[in-house]
């Protein structure tokens, strides 16, 4: 840690405590993530270290840059570029109103970051407003990319705060283990709806069952016809057969018709039918300049 001075604590992350830090040579402000490792562990698993070191190669303006990996006696500190606030805090400052141009800009930046990582075969797996960071220039950056693969997604944050299910797709809630890029696209859809509603989450489930019910009340309950193989997923449970809603304009009233169309292409229960990040970036919601109206 000699290279960095530890300053004040910024918060608790999924994997450990986050501090503000300063590079002693360049005076650059950074974020220091101290990763908590299990006490009975043999220190840092080599597989995790390999994964983490690969992430240093991911350089894109919409990805929070991993600057350094400091590894010593069972301690692992990840040094990231520092951003001013996360999307959750940004929402809290809004008082329930968001400029639709800002909503669109943030969503496009989110998709650009996703497309870049997906093209390098890196998934996020735990996207949520808390790990979308925003700097003073209105640039949005994805944080904690690839960490889920290196460390696993814990059921509880080490600070005992429960890891949110609100952005998890139905396939993962049903126990699917083979993750593809589609997991992040579902989360992106949940975030688009939340952006358009100035920070009100679309599916705020209290547990796995409640989460699935909230989703199916909107999208309709899937079955073997609409989603072949769904009933064979390891944690599948038969749920009441809800019809899909007919009016998305009531669900996300602030979002214009093109935005709603994109949302419907992201929020599809069957994972292989969700739109990709690359395709979503080309959607008329972003390309049509008259898109601000309804």
From Swiss-Prot:
Residues with Phosphotyrosine modification: 15
Binding positions (ATP): 10-18, 33
A single GO BP: motor neuron axon guidance
Keyword set, alphabetical order: ATP-binding, Cell cycle, Cell division, Kinase, Nucleotide-binding, Phosphoprotein, Serine/threonine-protein kinase, Transferase
Reactions the enzyme catalyzes: L-seryl-[protein] + ATP = O-phospho-L-seryl-[protein] + ADP + H(+); L-threonyl-[protein] + ATP = O-phospho-L-threonyl-[protein] + ADP + H(+)
Enzyme Commission number(s): 2.7.11.22
An annotated Gene Ontology molecular function: protein serine kinase activity
Modification Phosphoserine, positions: 159
Active site, per annotation: 126 (proton acceptor)
Location of Phosphothreonine modifications: 14
Domain Protein kinase: 4-286
Tissue specificity remark: Abundantly expressed in all adult tissues. Lower levels found in larvae and early embryos. Barely detectable in late embryos.
GO cellular component, one term: protein kinase 5 complex
Family: Belongs to the protein kinase superfamily. CMGC Ser/Thr protein kinase family. CDC2/CDKX subfamily.
Function description: Probably involved in the control of the cell cycle. Interacts with D1 and D3-type G1 cyclins. Possible regulator of neuronal differentiation and/or development.
Identification of the protein by name: Cyclin-dependent kinase 5 homolog
Organism ancestry: Eukaryota, Metazoa, Ecdysozoa, Arthropoda, Hexapoda
